[in-house]
Amino acid sequence: VLSSKDKANIKTAFGKIGGHAADYGAEALERMFLGFPTTKTYFPHFDLSHGSAQVKAHGKKVGDALTKAADHLDDLPSALSALSDLHAHKLRVDPVNFKLLSHCLLVTVAAHHPGDFTPAVDASLDKFLANVSTVLTSKYR
């Protein structure tokens, strides 16, 4: 459960992320592909090289989805329902991969905003990403 302080930290962080969400999403995907190469199996049709248009486009989708989620902290299931259906029924992404991408997203945000990435912000964003992951995997049954 996100506390009021967590929600404030998330809103503040996404305010700073601002128009960089797509770039950060792509960077986090690149980090994930490099650090956890087994995740590449879900993207066999992608050019996974640094700066590829496909990774950038998917990074934009990730960034847009997280921005939408950050704007709907009190109703993540509704905000992410279509995305949850897609990942559960069509893409069938192993749920562990959401945790890996979440880690890479945290590293990316920390790298770009080191002065703002306090332990409290880290904890709040980690809880937020865990909640998003839970929603995305909720329809796997």
From Swiss-Prot:
Family as reported in the entry's similarity comment: Belongs to the globin family.
Modified residue annotations for Phosphoserine: 3, 49, 102, 124, 138
Protein's name according to its UniProt entry: Hemoglobin subunit alpha
PANTHER family xref list: HEMOGLOBIN FAMILY MEMBER, HEMOGLOBIN SUBUNIT ALPHA
Modified positions (Phosphothreonine) in chain numbering: 108, 134, 137
Organism domain of life: Eukaryota
Expression (tissue specificity): Red blood cells.
Pfam families with a match to the protein in the record: Globin (PF00042)
An annotated Gene Ontology molecular function: oxygen carrier activity
Organism whose genome encodes this protein: Lama glama
Oligomeric and partner information: Heterotetramer of two alpha chains and two beta chains.
Modification type Phosphotyrosine: residues: 24
Binding of O2, residues: 58
Role: Involved in oxygen transport from the lung to the various peripheral tissues.
Entry binding sites for heme b: 87
Single GO biological process annotation from the record: hydrogen peroxide catabolic process
Cellular component per GO, a single term: hemoglobin complex
Alphabetic keyword roster: Acetylation, Heme, Iron, Metal-binding, Oxygen transport, Phosphoprotein, Transport
Residue stretches making up the Globin domain: 1-141
Modified residues (N6-acetyllysine): 16
Residues modified to N6-succinyllysine: 7, 11, 16, 40
InterPro entries membership: Globin, Globin-like_sf, Globin/Proto, Hemoglobin_a-typ, Hemoglobin_oxygen_transport, Hemoglobin_pi
Lineage: Eukaryota, Metazoa, Chordata, Craniata, Vertebrata
PROSITE patterns: GLOBIN
